[in-house]
Amino acid sequence: MSVYGLQRLYIGGGYVDATSGKTFDTFDPATGELLAQVQQASAADVDRAVASAQEGQREWAAMTAMQRSRILRRAVDLLRERNDELAAIETRDTGKPIGETLAVDIVTGADVIEYYAGLATAIEGLQVPLRAESFVYTRREPLGVCAGIGAWNYPIQIACWKTAPALAAGNAMVFKPSEVTPLTALKLAEIYTEAGVPAGVFNVVQGDGSVGALLTGHPDIAKVSFTGGVETGKKVMSLAGASSLKEVTMELGGKSPLIVFDDADLDRAADIAVTANFFSSGQVCTNGTRVFMHRSVKDAFTQKVLERVKRIRVGKPTDADTNFGPLVSAAQLDKVLGFIESGKAEGAKLLAGGTRLTDGHFGSGQYVAPTVFGDCRDDMKIVREEIFGPVMSILDFESEDEVIARANDTHYGLAAGVVTENLSRAHRTIHRLEAGICWINTWGESPAEMPVGGYKQSGVGRENGITTLEHYTRIKSVQVELGRYNPVF
């Protein structure tokens, strides 16, 4: 018997059964308990979801921007009213501490919907005079039906981030959450329907990567927004282009540098480094896992980091005192433990953690201790590759030019940060770092107003911020002639 029972697809404003006859299981990563059986969508189900979205989108786009804005604001109110209920589900599904999901996941998702609800009425075209009797005007029109493919680390937040600009601009979306954390996207669908979003405007299909491929290759999907790993992102982008030249937004992986200069407030720097590596058990794409510290502060900084790691409260995610939970799945645990063994084998110095936690209730969950490696080199696997777990690599440097070159020596370019009391140095360094999201003397906040996305192989396009609306509209140019038409023939 599962906790939440059988989970169906959400198409056309309500729950429907999948036609595949297949289901998959989702588990609580803290206890191993079966949470739900989830119906897997078939190709016919994807077609049905897209057709429903096309119908709903026509009704949604015909509304005024103010009408759409009011409906989205009602959805925000409902999300906030149900915050505690949704946070409890998210904690069971992801393993995140309840204090984290209560304060972050639904809250920040609702903030983004509220932000775009306010911008819905600000989508407008231009008027361009050509001469006394002729002018051009432009219209920003919705794309139509978009596909959203979510990652397992922030299920409901990612669903909100992808739907908010799409719906504000008059589009519909068919969303596929990760099969690892599939539950809360369905709750978001319920909320949109209750708020007054027309049937079909937000549909949820469940399943593995094969369902994502069906969406990506579907001829009636105009755009794909994907969050996940680099290699999968490349496949999505290739299929999107090959099928129908779809627009894409890609929020992919990272191996982000955090640079601590010799004049930094070391207490602040240590606080930032620990947050940038161990928040959400290290399962955050923007984590600052390559911590570069100036050689002159190596010992003092490392000691402060280790003091803070000892204060991390690993425990049951449902306990209010816990601030560090399990990894999301057994597969992710095995991956992280493999990286830890690689670090040991390549000569990194293990300063903290490095083991799976198995005592007591930890034995039934996917727990690994917060891990810190010192004496790391740039060529180590733990320094070069994204781990997506609680593993910090500490490296030292001597000069500004040196550390910038080393920080940029990666095919990733998602995030970067510096800690220094010298603002000139801070801005000078940030301007040279090849990353799309940067922080000075802080780390990790991604407010609705801030565009987020990567350079290089960390992504294409942006999420959040005003600029994202451009990625969910297309421009129509119209010339108007008020005077005499001069024929060519």
Curated annotation (Swiss-Prot):
Its cofactor is K(+). Its EC number is 1.2.1.8. SUPFAM superfamilies: ALDH-like. The active site is at K162, E251, C285, E463. Pathway: Amine and polyamine biosynthesis; betaine biosynthesis via choline pathway; betaine from betaine aldehyde: step 1/1. One of its GO terms (molecular function) is betaine-aldehyde dehydrogenase (NAD+) activity. It catalyses: betaine aldehyde + NAD(+) + H2O = glycine betaine + NADH + 2 H(+). K(+) 1 binds at T26, D93, V180. NAD(+) binds at G150, A151, W152, K176, P177, S178, E179, G229, V230, E231, T232, G253, C285, E386. Transmembrane segments: none annotated. The record marks E247 as: Seems to be a necessary countercharge to the potassium cations. InterPro entries: Ald_DH/histidinol_DH, Ald_DH_C, Ald_DH_CS_CYS, Ald_DH_CS_GLU, Ald_DH_N, Aldehyde_DH_dom, BADH. The modification Cysteine sulfenic acid (-SOH) is found at C285. Keywords: Metal-binding, NAD, NADP, Oxidation, Oxidoreductase, Potassium. It is an enzyme of class 1 (oxidoreductase). Binds 2 potassium ions per subunit. K(+) 2 binds at L245, K456, G459. GO terms for biological process: glycine betaine biosynthetic process from choline. Involved in the biosynthesis of the osmoprotectant glycine betaine. Catalyzes the irreversible oxidation of betaine aldehyde to the corresponding acid. Dimer of dimers. Belongs to the aldehyde dehydrogenase family. This is Betaine aldehyde dehydrogenase. It comes from Burkholderia cenocepacia (strain ATCC BAA-245 / DSM 16553 / LMG 16656 / NCTC 13227 / J2315 / CF5610) (Burkholderia cepacia (strain J2315)). The gene is betB.
